[in-house]
């Protein structure tokens, strides 16, 4: 079995999907390249709905984190802000930029400053008071738990029901934008995928999926993830991912794909 590591282009996914033998080539990848296929980007020559999924690192939770001393310690206070609230982000395609853009599309007074070269730099900027907030995965504070423990930042909105009493992102946007939210949040909801080409024989895919589940439950594997600061969500089984991916592709209409691209502006 050959494993292909992520590359800065959808080419490996294209190879696995369109030319790889059904028995041997697999791709370990963040879901972003599968989104390229879901939105029917001309650069992608693969259909993510047809690939064989072995498993993933699983669902994670993100939140909108704010410095309470900025005057915003709840989503209601954010909505009441008289001026747009600045959030730090990496780049136009990162979730810390696209999720706030989706909120802004729905009337939430936020704007994003992009260009930080790492989430750690954004967290440092927040700590130093340069920007008051960030949309960030909870596990992203693994190296800076003090920011949460000392309430330098507090969550005011979340993507999964983790923090009691906090509103969910999907509940504060228009119902018509929820398919768009599914696309924006796909990275955290699919996790890091292990995917192979279409038409892998059922007995082989079942064996691979069983092995992936066994690995995910292994304490040494979990300890390795913790040491490497790899986000650890709730692992997803391959058949679950396949069903989710088909739904994502089916619900990503041309209008949704166009709206997704506009969030990058």
Describe the function of each predicted region.
Residues 30-44, 94-106, 120, 128, ...:
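A ligand-binding cleft/hinge motif common to bilobed small-molecule-binding domains
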């Amino acid at each position: 079995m050959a494993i292909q590591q992520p590359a800065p282009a959808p080419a490996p996914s294209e190879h696995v999907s369109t030319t790889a033998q059904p028995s041997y080539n697999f791709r370990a990848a963040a879901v972003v390249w599968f989104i390229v296929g879901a939105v029917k980007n001309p650069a992608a020559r693969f259909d993510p709905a047809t690939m064989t999924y072995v498993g993933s690192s699983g669902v994670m939770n993100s939140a909108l984190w704010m410095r309470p001393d900025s005057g915003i310690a709840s989503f209601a206070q954010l909505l009441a802000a008289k001026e747009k609230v600045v959030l730090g982000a990496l780049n136009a395609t990162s979730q810390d930029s696209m999720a706030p853009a989706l909120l802004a599309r729905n009337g939430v007074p936020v704007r994003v400053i992009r260009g930080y070269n790492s989430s750690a730099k954004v967290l440092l900027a927040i700590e130093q008071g340069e920007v008051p907030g960030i949309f960030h995965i909870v596990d992203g504070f693994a190296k800076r738990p003090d920011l949460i423990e000392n309430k330098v930042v507090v969550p005011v909105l979340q993507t999964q029901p983790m923090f009691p009493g906090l509103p969910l992102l999907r509940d504060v946007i228009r119902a018509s934008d929820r398919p768009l939210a599914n696309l924006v949040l796909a990275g955290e909801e699919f996790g890091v995928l292990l995917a192979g080409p279409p038409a892998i024989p059922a007995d082989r895919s079942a064996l691979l999926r069983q092995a992936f589940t066994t690995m995910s439950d292994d304490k040494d594997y979990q300890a390795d993830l913790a040491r490497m600061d790899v986000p650890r969500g709730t692992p997803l089984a391959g058949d679950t991912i396949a069903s989710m991916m088909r739904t994502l592709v089916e619900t990503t209409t041309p209008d949704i794909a166009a709206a997704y691209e506009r969030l990058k502006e």
